[in-house]
């Protein structure tokens, strides 16, 4: 396993087991550590986790960030690692990045997995996300509110170590908070380009938790109907971070 920085100072971890690598893209405000349950379960596969621009150990100094910036980040990382083909897994903002990547670099993808993605938000849904973004701009702590949306109360009671990990990840110093806001702004104001989405022909699996209030089952079903070569699986009893709370169910589908 290599844990290192590429020439562009992107932090990554690469476990090379000789298979087509599975690349994981985390969500806004998080980092590569959110995928621990998947990496442990997929220990016989080649896997890559990395920190997005302005997240975790990867720096970012520009005033704004775009999906194109994030897609180019991944292209450059793959070029550095000399990898031509991947399976790509994106969560939340990561799924929007994964779709953008797929629309531009389908030749690099074997399969695409979108987890907890948003799609065709209603005006009410959009305003709720923008309200949370505006709270974040005022430096109001969102950590505990976010965890209530992402996990069930019962799970966090049984797994205090998960609670502690995500409080640590979400508790930003001022410079990290500024970069967090850049990505949060992108996520909150995102509008789907349906014409581009309909051109993606990569075999795609879409998953979301049955109790995910922000990235709903209805959104995922709608996306699946617009993606030509896709299927949808509802993760029973899962909230937004069903990849952790319902890791066994998610991992079985990743392996399949």
Regions of interest found by a model, annotated:
Residues 99-104, 109-140:
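Flexible "cap/lid" loop of the alpha/beta hydrolase fold
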Residues 210-215:
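Acidic catalytic loop of the alpha/beta-hydrolase fold
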Residues 10, 14-59, 63, 77:
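Conserved HGGG/HGGXW glycine-rich cap/lid loop of the alpha/beta-hydrolase fold
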Residues 200, 206-208:
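Short beta-strand/loop motif that positions the catalytic acidic residue
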Residues 69-86:
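Conserved acidic catalytic loop of the alpha/beta-hydrolase fold
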Residues 90-94, 98:
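Gly/Ala-rich beta-loop-alpha elbow adjacent to hydrolase catalytic centers
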Residues 123-125, 140-198:
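Conserved alpha/beta-hydrolase catalytic His-Asp/Glu region
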Residues 238-251:
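Catalytic histidine-centered segment of alpha/beta-hydrolase-like enzymes
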């Amino acid at each position: 396993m290599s844990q290192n920085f590429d020439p562009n100072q992107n932090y990554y971890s690469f476990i090379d087991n000789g298979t087509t690598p599975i690349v994981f893209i985390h969500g806004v405000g998080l980092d590569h550590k959110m995928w621990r349950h998947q990496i442990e379960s997929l220990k016989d596969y080649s896997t890559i986790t990395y920190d997005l621009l302005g997240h975790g150990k990867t720096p970012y100094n520009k005033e704004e960030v775009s999906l194109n910036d994030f897609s180019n980040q991944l292209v450059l990382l793959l070029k550095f690692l000399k990898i031509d083909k991947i399976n790509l897994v994106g969560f939340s903002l990561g799924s929007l990045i994964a779709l953008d990547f797929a629309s531009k670099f389908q030749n690099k993808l074997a399969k695409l997995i979108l987890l907890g993605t948003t799609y065709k938000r209603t005006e009410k849904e959009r305003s709720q996300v923008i309200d949370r973004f505006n709270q974040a701009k005022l430096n109001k702590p969102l950590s505990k509110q976010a965890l209530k949306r992402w996990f069930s109360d019962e799970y966090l009671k049984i797994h205090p170590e998960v609670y502690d990990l995500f409080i640590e990840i979400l508790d930003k110093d001022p410079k990290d908070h500024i970069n967090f806001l850049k990505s949060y702004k992108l996520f909150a104001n995102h509008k789907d380009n349906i014409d581009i989405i309909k051109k993606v022909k990569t075999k795609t699996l879409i998953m979301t938790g049955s109790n995910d209030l922000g990235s709903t089952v209805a959104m995922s079903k709608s996306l699946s109907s617009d993606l030509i070569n896709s299927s949808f699986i509802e993760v029973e009893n899962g909230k937004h971070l069903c990849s952790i709370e319902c890791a066994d169910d998610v991992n079985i589908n990743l392996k399949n």
